[in-house]
Amino acid sequence: GVLYPNLIGYAVMPAAIALIILTVRAVVKGRYQKLWTLIPTLLLGLIGCALAHPNALVSVAVFVVPFLLAMIGKVVRTYRKSRQTAIAGGIILAALATCVAVWYMIRPGEFASNTWTSVMSEGEAVYQFLFFGLENANQLGDKFEPSYIMAFLTLWGAGYLIYKRRNLWIITSWILVGYLWVISASVERGPFRMLMVSPWYTDHFRLATLVVLPGVILSGIGLGAIVQSVLKFVLARLPRVNDTRYTQVLLVASAVIVLVAAGFTSRTQAVHDATLAVSKEYRIEPSSVIVSSDEMNVIEHIPDYVPQGDIIANNPWDGSPYIYSLVHRNLTGYHFDFKTDEKYRPIYKHLKDAKTDPEVCKVVNENNVHWYVHFKNPLNFGPDAQNLYDGMSDAVENGVLTPVYTSGEMGLYRISACDS
């Protein structure tokens, strides 16, 4: 996301989740003195998640629900009629209710999910979830590349936790996040899809990224279990001598195993290719989707004509909000997700009729909106919202504007029909 960088939110998530786990365990064990440092740190972590991207905060809430349920089970199993048990149970229940409320309440309007639909069958989605393909090459042409070693290590890690009956909630978190991914990738648009995954805009890419977090934890546990088993096997067959060289050799062997596994499971090339494909959209070229070379040419010349206090009428879906960040001129629309200011509605809907509709010029002159910028929206972003701006897009051909600076089809215009 340009406004909210989703990956930054996901990068903060592991620390926020770890802080929640430490805080809850401190409460359960009655180590309240630790809360003086844990709670402020946790609040900062959660605020950081929310600022980076709101759906990262929702992701934290979803991820820790199985952990909180496990902690409630532990409190119930070890129940003692004591104040500490009552406090611990109450705090965990409150935290669980908060997580559900965060998932239910922090979500954009339904229109924000219009872009994302189901892209595969349920069976294919489950297969991709288990084998960590997760559309890793979709940016380059819908090619599924399963990671068999990663899948094996993850399933081995899950089996190891089940065998040891330890931290089973991690498996549940992995399955829960995977279930949300399957919904976003395979379930048709409807009330159920909107209920379950609209906090992520029903965007399967966001949830594909999220699946990796519990998957990596499980695969790390699986790799650790394998290395541990290999070391035990080797040690059992070595002479029992008190020689530190054995330990050193085994540590080196362990490091080699880990590095080899990392080499075979890394998706460096896939990440490189996807990053390269996305980076092309941010280059200033004639065909660039975000800001083309013609649009940038117009933006750079706007300060030569538009005074600091004037406002430029614009359609926020066409890239024109970059005018504000790049050359510091005010606009009628700074971001397509912001609510349209009602006072500008006559301009949006009827600028083309400025010669015959006095309401248009009244708004133009009262608010110093003497300019209009015309850019392109080549991918037709926000198709449902474009009718809000029909009056401006048609004004170019209606004789109510005077071109001030143009480059190709892009241009800055003076709303000359409203000049006294």
Question: Can you say where each PLM-predicted feature lies in the sequence?
Answer:
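Membrane-embedded transmembrane-helix bundle of lipid-linked glycan/lipid transferases
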Residues: G1-V278, S325, N367, W371-H374, ...
